[in-house]
Amino acid sequence: MNDAGASIGRHRGCLLLFVALAVAFSSYVEQVESMPAEPVSQWPTFPRRNIAALARDGYLRNSASRAYKRGISTLAKNGLLPTYRSPYVETDKEDQNQDESQEKRNMASIARLRSYAAMKRNIQALARDGYRVGRGQYNPSNDKRNIAALARNGLLHKKDEATENEYYFPFYQNPIAPLSEIDHPLDVNEMYDFQQSMNPDMFPSMSQVYKRSLYEPYYDYYSPKDYDNSYFKRSSAGSPVHGLYRPNYLEPNTRTKRYVMPYPDILEGDEMIEQNDIDGEKRSVDDDDDDDDDDGEVHENFQKRHIGSLARLGLLPSFRYSGGRYSRSGRARLLLPSQELYRKHSPDENFGIREYLSSPEVESPVDPDDADIPPPPVPAHSHPTGRLLHRPLSNDLPHTSPLPLPPIAPTNYADTFTKNRWQSYTKETPKFYYFRSLKVPYHTSGKRYLLLPAVDNILLRKGYRNSSLPSRRKNQ
């Protein structure tokens, strides 16, 4: 019995000891939790005294600050230095001691007081800290002043956009959130942003986004703003879906200029192209020749639209006419180099322009005595190919042949300029020497007065055939 009573007593003592320890521990926990969260001294009692080691171990980190910066410029900008006096968070906050400003009479001392509305007096510092409206008003600080950073963050407004309903968000280099923050499957827009970040060449960038305003008609296909907008220049698709309106795809009609898909098979009545119109658009020289031979007349409305063809036909205004030599159509004015010298200096404005001849005019009356004589292979005033040539006018150079003579240099080339048949060399009309578009007077001694010594060589070259261009007089 004694042994049983002793064991019961020991168990009872152990139970009481356990209960006492539990009560003491709970009271200690309550006392610790009742202590203030921010004690006066935050410095721990550790053997380390080097500030670099303490900062590296994280003992200098302030729980209130989000960015653990140690650079003095960054700390000064964020207001973490002891000497920094940050502006008031509240606009109308008043200083507790308003009377201390009465003790100061120096303007600099008054400006340094906390009761002063703005501690900074430099306009650049005021603009950087957000005092753009006035000293008594506080705006949120904007650390970025570079125009590229402002444009990237969406802080630049467009002139053609409504500023009431613009949604901006910074365009990050990687628009996809970290894996630790993704708690749901990605939607279509977020998948597009991921594809855009991986392959920016295939998907349009943020600068090519069309931002839609609420005041704009939702399905306005014919609105000029849809196509004149600076964001809609190259594409109507995507940007990061962070507070931005995703533009809807507008199915363009057949009149849309930027419609890159093929046109439908059904065409409207005014767009139907007849086969006759296609045949009428042919601009072949051979077809024109056949028409001229069949009709016996020349069409005045030329079908040619190429600038080279128009220049060869002489239909383009120019200071110096140089066409006709390389014409393949036979309609150009047939001017020789010797005639070209006098064309611009002739009083007749129609100099060098010749008339077409019809078939009855070309055919000479047939003598009944010559009926047995075969006709000549090439009729007069005609081309070997069958094209009718021009009728020479009275102001052309006189010659015996109906066709223009080739520019063969005479024995004395200078006599061609002295014996000008169009000029009456009197005292009232002095002699002139013509070279292209220049009109140079003769010297009083009777010799030519040359502006450049190389003119003689040029004139001598013009008198010989041009062997480098064998087809120059091919069709003339």
From Swiss-Prot:
Domain of life, per lineage: Eukaryota
Acidic residues: bias regions: 286-297
Modified positions (Valine amide) in chain numbering: 133
Major subcellular location class: secreted
Intracellular or extracellular location(s): Secreted
Tissue and organ distribution: Neuropeptide-like precursor 1-1: Expressed in antennal lobe (AL), corpora cardiaca (CC), corpora allata (CA) and gnathal ganglion (GNG) (at protein level). Expression in AL detected in all animals, in GNG in most animals, expression in CC and CA in few animals (at protein level). Neuropeptide-like precursor 1-2: Expressed in antennal lobe (AL), corpora cardiaca (CC), corpora allata (CA) and gnathal ganglion (GNG) (at protein level). Expression in AL detected in all animals, in GNG in some animals, expression in CC and CA in few animals (at protein level).
GO annotation terms (biological process): neuropeptide signaling pathway
Keywords for the protein's UniProt record, in alphabetical order: Amidation, Cleavage on pair of basic residues, Neuropeptide, Secreted, Signal
Region of interest (Disordered), residue spans: 275-298, 360-385
Prodomain residues: 160-232, 259-476
Residues of the signal peptide: 1-34
GO cellular component, one term: extracellular region
Protein name according to UniProt: Neuropeptide-like precursor 1
Organism field: Agrotis ipsilon
